[in-house]
Amino acid sequence: MNKHASQPRAIYYVVALQIWEYFSFYGMRALLILYLTNQLKYNDTHAYELFSAYCSLVYVTPILGGFLADKVLGNRMAVMLGALLMAIGHVVLGASEIHPSFLYLSLAIIVCGYGLFKSNVSCLLGELYEPTDPRRDGGFSLMYAAGNVGSIIAPIACGYAQEEYSWAMGFGLAAVGMIAGLVIFLCGNRHFTHTRGVNKKVLRATNFLLPNWGWLLVLLVATPALITILFWKEWSVYALIVATIIGLGVLAKIYRKAENQKQRKELGLIVTLTFFSMLFWAFAQQGGSSISLYIDRFVNRDMFGYTVPTAMFQSINAFAVMLCGVFLAWVVKESVAGNRTVRIWGKFALGLGLMSAGFCILTLSARWSAMYGHSSLPLMVLGLAVMGFAELFIDPVAMSQITRIEIPGVTGVLTGIYMLLSGAIANYLAGVIADQTSQASFDASGAINYSINAYIEVFDQITWGALACVGLVLMIWLYQALKFRNRALALES
């Protein structure tokens, strides 16, 4: 590997794949809740349940995907297989109007593909560098920024394709994006020869009457089938319960593994941060469900004579994250003075405060809709942008703290537990919250009248709920600040 190159050539193929994966995933996600309600005519409750189940399980399957990559497939093969499964899933989703079983099957295939892809693409990128290579951080930053580009473009492109042509075309465009990324990645295959490939020895070994490659095929067929049943029977909550129990058990084992009080305090800090992060994301994930339907039903989307497709609003959040992230990275320089724990809680308070402010703006928007029939587009854009800005003070802070823990060999496991709680469980809670907006009545002609008051009430409750979290976090911040101050005074005396 050339140490003098700005970045290894292989990274550009990984980045291209990451852009198209974000394009594929977020393009489809922007359409899903609208497809369920507007095209398949699911009631809001059923749509929210399926949407939250899907968004929850995509954070559970990466655990299995990471295990398969570590033991058998290697990161490169796992990523390619995951990308292929996601493309197939999007194609099948386009045919779901034929029969509901195609809907459940397509979502299950996408969940499995996401599990193989998401947990291993970062590991594949890490394989391109030596442990001490100074280019490593720059490579990960490049991949993160590229992903945001994909998530900005996807809702615009897929939303336009759906609005101007058909739902199948919107989902098909997401599939084309994933296939394009996979083709580009395969074109750079020669640059990945030094990365870990398939473990052929393990694959050929025999266990329980079958070679491991046979069991792998069984797993690749059985897992989508099982997840399809979970979606169909609405049993996904049981899978989350099992995963959470296992995660908490592992967390207890890590706590016992801690060798001193400092390590236990670090773990306690991570657990507390994870709890508040879970609540934050339960609020933030309204963007793909209740907020999306609110925009579709109650926001005036006309701009210069063009009606902006609802799905396009999903780009605002990603654009705010990227724009504000660049601003914070280039302009704001964090001081090393003071106590790091105090700074962490200060950032969490700011993130939750911005989330509360964002929903306060949405509450005003909903009240405007109640008074005048429709809310204004700029007010909606402002609320979503503030919520996107809030994200920068939650996940990066928590993940940074996890990587600092001094208990050896637990960083990956803690990251998985964090994703389980702040991703899977938070998305389930988001579905429960969103369902509170599903109040509707029928007029004499049988048309559905959706209740704007339900949206006002839910947005208002989230505003105050996030503000209550800010109060709790500020109490912790004040306690830590006073403790640090008293310790400093004691040392001076």
UniProtKB/Swiss-Prot annotation:
<feature type="topological domain" description="Periplasmic">
    <location>
        <begin position="288"/>
        <end position="311"/>
    </location>
</feature>
<keyword id="KW-1003">Cell membrane</keyword>
<feature type="transmembrane region" description="Helical">
    <location>
        <begin position="78"/>
        <end position="98"/>
    </location>
</feature>
<feature type="topological domain" description="Periplasmic">
    <location>
        <begin position="99"/>
        <end position="100"/>
    </location>
</feature>
<feature type="transmembrane region" description="Helical">
    <location>
        <begin position="212"/>
        <end position="232"/>
    </location>
</feature>
<feature type="transmembrane region" description="Helical">
    <location>
        <begin position="235"/>
        <end position="255"/>
    </location>
</feature>
<keyword id="KW-0812">Transmembrane</keyword>
<dbReference type="InterPro" id="IPR005279">
    <property type="entry name" value="Dipep/tripep_permease"/>
</dbReference>
<keyword id="KW-1133">Transmembrane helix</keyword>
<protein>
    <recommendedName>
        <fullName>Dipeptide permease D</fullName>
    </recommendedName>
</protein>
<feature type="topological domain" description="Periplasmic">
    <location>
        <begin position="434"/>
        <end position="461"/>
    </location>
</feature>
<dbReference type="InterPro" id="IPR018456">
    <property type="entry name" value="PTR2_symporter_CS"/>
</dbReference>
<feature type="transmembrane region" description="Helical">
    <location>
        <begin position="167"/>
        <end position="187"/>
    </location>
</feature>
<feature type="transmembrane region" description="Helical">
    <location>
        <begin position="267"/>
        <end position="287"/>
    </location>
</feature>
<dbReference type="InterPro" id="IPR020846">
    <property type="entry name" value="MFS_dom"/>
</dbReference>
<feature type="topological domain" description="Cytoplasmic">
    <location>
        <begin position="256"/>
        <end position="266"/>
    </location>
</feature>
<feature type="topological domain" description="Periplasmic">
    <location>
        <begin position="233"/>
        <end position="234"/>
    </location>
</feature>
<feature type="topological domain" description="Cytoplasmic">
    <location>
        <begin position="1"/>
        <end position="13"/>
    </location>
</feature>
<feature type="transmembrane region" description="Helical">
    <location>
        <begin position="462"/>
        <end position="482"/>
    </location>
</feature>
<feature type="topological domain" description="Cytoplasmic">
    <location>
        <begin position="400"/>
        <end position="412"/>
    </location>
</feature>
<feature type="transmembrane region" description="Helical">
    <location>
        <begin position="138"/>
        <end position="158"/>
    </location>
</feature>
<dbReference type="InterPro" id="IPR000109">
    <property type="entry name" value="POT_fam"/>
</dbReference>
<dbReference type="GO" id="GO:0015333">
    <property type="term" value="F:peptide:proton symporter activity"/>
</dbReference>
<comment type="similarity">
    <text>Belongs to the major facilitator superfamily. Proton-dependent oligopeptide transporter (POT/PTR) (TC 2.A.17) family. DtpD subfamily.</text>
</comment>
<dbReference type="GO" id="GO:0035442">
    <property type="term" value="P:dipeptide transmembrane transport"/>
</dbReference>
<dbReference type="GO" id="GO:0071916">
    <property type="term" value="F:dipeptide transmembrane transporter activity"/>
</dbReference>
<dbReference type="GO" id="GO:0042937">
    <property type="term" value="F:tripeptide transmembrane transporter activity"/>
</dbReference>
<dbReference type="Pfam" id="PF00854">
    <property type="entry name" value="PTR2"/>
</dbReference>
<feature type="topological domain" description="Cytoplasmic">
    <location>
        <begin position="122"/>
        <end position="137"/>
    </location>
</feature>
<dbReference type="InterPro" id="IPR023777">
    <property type="entry name" value="AA/pep_transptr_DtpD"/>
</dbReference>
<feature type="topological domain" description="Cytoplasmic">
    <location>
        <begin position="188"/>
        <end position="211"/>
    </location>
</feature>
<feature type="transmembrane region" description="Helical">
    <location>
        <begin position="49"/>
        <end position="69"/>
    </location>
</feature>
<feature type="topological domain" description="Periplasmic">
    <location>
        <begin position="365"/>
        <end position="378"/>
    </location>
</feature>
<feature type="topological domain" description="Cytoplasmic">
    <location>
        <begin position="70"/>
        <end position="77"/>
    </location>
</feature>
<keyword id="KW-0997">Cell inner membrane</keyword>
<feature type="transmembrane region" description="Helical">
    <location>
        <begin position="312"/>
        <end position="332"/>
    </location>
</feature>
<comment type="function">
    <text>Probable proton-dependent permease that transports dipeptides.</text>
</comment>
<keyword id="KW-0653">Protein transport</keyword>
<dbReference type="InterPro" id="IPR036259">
    <property type="entry name" value="MFS_trans_sf"/>
</dbReference>
<dbReference type="GO" id="GO:0005886">
    <property type="term" value="C:plasma membrane"/>
</dbReference>
<dbReference type="InterPro" id="IPR050171">
    <property type="entry name" value="MFS_Transporters"/>
</dbReference>
<feature type="topological domain" description="Periplasmic">
    <location>
        <begin position="159"/>
        <end position="166"/>
    </location>
</feature>
